[in-house]
């Protein structure tokens, strides 16, 4: 498929086609240049995939999406097999084109007005007690999708009054005031927004995003709801140093964030940003110790940790790595 000149609405652009649209060019990694995964990065697949197929079927039946599938998460088999999933609202096409992410880029269609009801019913049918709701970036919407988040939260709580809801939100670039007015009126139980990496390489990792803007989003939500935990996550292995990661942790604490996730970046395809290093489990343990010493109440740090990986256990302060 050649580089599209005009993107067609509703078409998913992935891998080389997606990367061709990024202003900061990324050269595809030659296979012989790929870093070999260390032993600690090997995943054991479950012997029985019945539960996995059941969750996928429930998603398809209601026209829902999971970030687990759309972003090719390495923990999909484990989480689905335990009956948990992170739901991705507002469609499966992102208006951003971050070169670390496997979610498709393009011109998305209008949000499904029935999605909040379908999502709430699916969650009730699955009898979930803790759910994570995330979304693609929707720079095409005046509120960045904030009202859709609020509608989903309201619908879920109507069907499942005892449930705990964590939202993993985009940065609402250029729409922070409007988005926060909506989100603070219908708050989740945990408010999550990922910084992803360090300021020095932000333009390469998150083109179109701004490090300080993301910190401000987290801070302003916390100011509006001091009683609600705020959370953020980073990937390691993109060219940053451990010292830079620790400095980002300090920035997060200065902006009121109390929950942290650190995990290893994995290259979705050779067209995405390459893995520069694999961080050892011992290094993750050291960074967790630093985080707790800084005052984070929860810190999940490990090779396979993702922002929503065992989020229910993270919220309880249980060991996740």
Swiss-Prot record:
Protein's UniProt keywords contain Transmembrane: no
Cofactor note: Binds 2 [4Fe-4S] clusters per subunit. One cluster is coordinated with 3 cysteines and an exchangeable S-adenosyl-L-methionine.
Activity regulation, free text: Is physiologically inhibited by accumulation of the reaction product 5'-deoxyadenosine. Inhibited by the AdoMet analog S-adenosyl homocysteine.
Biological processes, Gene Ontology terms: lipoate biosynthetic process
Pathway: Protein modification; protein lipoylation via endogenous pathway; protein N(6)-(lipoyl)lysine from octanoyl-[acyl-carrier-protein]: step 2/2
Catalytic activity: [[Fe-S] cluster scaffold protein carrying a second [4Fe-4S](2+) cluster] + N(6)-octanoyl-L-lysyl-[protein] + 2 oxidized [2Fe-2S]-[ferredoxin] + 2 S-adenosyl-L-methionine + 4 H(+) = [[Fe-S] cluster scaffold protein] + N(6)-[(R)-dihydrolipoyl]-L-lysyl-[protein] + 4 Fe(3+) + 2 hydrogen sulfide + 2 5'-deoxyadenosine + 2 L-methionine + 2 reduced [2Fe-2S]-[ferredoxin]
Residues the entry annotates as binding [4Fe-4S] cluster 1: 68, 73, 79, 308
Database matches in Pfam families: LIAS_N, Radical_SAM
GO cellular component: cytoplasm; cytosol
InterPro entries: Aldolase_TIM, Elp3/MiaA/NifB-like_rSAM, LIAS_N, Lipoyl_synth, rSAM
Quaternary data: Monomer or homodimer.
Name of the protein this chain belongs to: Lipoyl synthase
Gene: lipA
